[in-house]
Amino acid sequence: MAINAQEISALIKKQIEDFQPNFDVTETGIVTYIGDGIARARGLDNAMSGELLEFSNGAYGMAQNLESNDVGIIILGDFSEIREGDVVKRTGKIMEVPVGEAMIGRVVNPLGQPVDGLGEIETTATRPVETPAPGVMQRKSVFEPLQTGLKAIDALVPIGRGQRELIIGDRQTGKTSVAIDAILNQKGQDMICIYVAIGQKESTVRTQVETLRKYGALDYTIVVTASASQPSPLLFIAPYAGVAMAEEFMYNGKHVLIVYDDLSKQAVAYRELSLLLRRPPGREAYPGDVFYLHSRLLERSAKLSDALGGGSITALPFIETQAGDISAYIATNVISITDGQIFLQENLFNSGIRPAIDAGSSVSRVGGAAQIKAMKRVAGTLRLDLASYRELEAFTQFGSDLDAATQAKLNRGRRTVEVLKQPLHKPLPVEKQVVILYALTHGFLDDVPVNDILAFEEALYDYFDAHYDNLFETIRTTKDLPEEAELDAAIQAFKDQSQFK
């Protein structure tokens, strides 16, 4: 059989034309150092800052330092299987976390993977962990109240939707309890809550999750946890993962409350990473951009304009102080970023005043605009009364000869302190807070013994629920006080039929 040269060349040409190249082009590098949650790799000359990188064993990292010779990478997750000489490749993507309704009621790690043993999370939506905060024109002033259910906060340092309110205090002063109570009080308020636990013991996180489940709050809450036993990159990334999940709801017109418990531990984790990446240390060995670490996180909490749907993220960041020192580096940084702070004091906590809020050092810079009219009217002078009581109390240590006016002020002050106490996990609806504060400021408690105040309060609520529910309804719907004569008569009627005459 004769071989036709033309046929052969036509066949070869056809083969060449039909050839489909079947290979992927990826930029890869080689790991030159590994340890303590950090890797260095050569050969990734075009890597982007914050880009997700994949190691040969399937672990992921994030490019942090882009240097002339190599790239500093923080490893997200377990780094025990990574070795020097391993291949690391670019993905061309920045780090994203899963978001959406499917996350609600779940406990996840900072990568959005479930850790509660309840199976996979069915969601395809994702958001980048680092995104720019809304601009000035995309925002709106804070004007809607976020009721925490705690009298001391809602009366003295009110919080509005879209506000950042720092909770600062020593360890074991009830910071977490304040936030958990605020989450419990959002039941039925069409609010989604996110609790970010940073560097907590796993047993502690478990306790908080069980508390939320017990009171039915897990139905509208996402828990993001980076426990103390996890590598520092996960502690560093956890708050950003939490706020990315919150932004998905905010940009869909919903309201979110996010709690960061606590940012001191995130700053320590970031300091560890920065020192391992050989970034120059500054004050207290923190890197120079530790302010930006927190400012870019907290600026993402906002009240959006109506054009963008009017959603909001309200942030409650925590800072743990040492011996009540609120002038420490990280504490002053976060105080200057937030719209106010609630300072919890150890000596108040130990003397049985809980929540242990120091009214003198606590302030809400924008919450006043969000406070309902009824609360404004009953709590207007409360802060001044408390401050003058504390001053007089210190003064009376030296002598007992007091005129009647001073004695009356002291008596009112003691009752104010007692009224602002509240049992754990029992947040109060705002209408009940208004009634008891009205009774306090209008002298109805002046003849009630201090030790009976809490019993008086419970009995008053029960009596109003049974006989004067219309007054509660008026406060709920109009956000203002009912007729003073009507309220006075109702409280007096309760006193007349009770043992607190």
From Swiss-Prot:
Note the SUPFAM superfamilies from the entry: C-terminal domain of alpha and beta subunits of F1 ATP synthase, N-terminal domain of alpha and beta subunits of F1 ATP synthase, P-loop containing nucleoside triphosphate hydrolases
- Which cellular components does GO assign to this protein? plasma membrane; proton-transporting ATP synthase complex
Known catalysed reaction(s)?
ATP + H2O + 4 H(+)(in) = ADP + phosphate + 5 H(+)(out)
Annotated binding of ATP, by residue: 169-176
What keywords tag this UniProt record?
ATP synthesis, ATP-binding, Cell membrane, CF(1), Hydrogen ion transport, Ion transport, Membrane, Nucleotide-binding, Translocase, Transport
User: Is Translocase set as a keyword in this record?
Assistant: yes
What enzyme category does the UniProt record give? translocase
- Write out the annotated subcellular location: Cell membrane
The main location class comes to: membrane
* Single GO molecular function: ADP binding
Cite the record's note on assembly. F-type ATPases have 2 components, CF(1) - the catalytic core - and CF(0) - the membrane proton channel. CF(1) has five subunits: alpha(3), beta(3), gamma(1), delta(1), epsilon(1). CF(0) has three main subunits: a(1), b(2) and c(9-12). The alpha and beta chains form an alternating ring which encloses part of the gamma chain. CF(1) is attached to CF(0) by a central stalk formed by the gamma and epsilon chains, while a peripheral stalk is formed by the delta and b chains.
The record's function comment reads: Produces ATP from ADP in the presence of a proton gradient across the membrane. The alpha chain is a regulatory subunit.
What family is reported? Belongs to the ATPase alpha/beta chains family.
Name the NCBIfam families on file: atpA, PRK13343.1
HAMAP family associated with the record: ATP_synth_alpha_bact
- Indicate what this protein is called per its UniProt record: ATP synthase subunit alpha
Source organism of this protein record: Streptococcus agalactiae serotype III (strain NEM316)
- From the UniProt record, report the name of the gene that encodes this protein: atpA
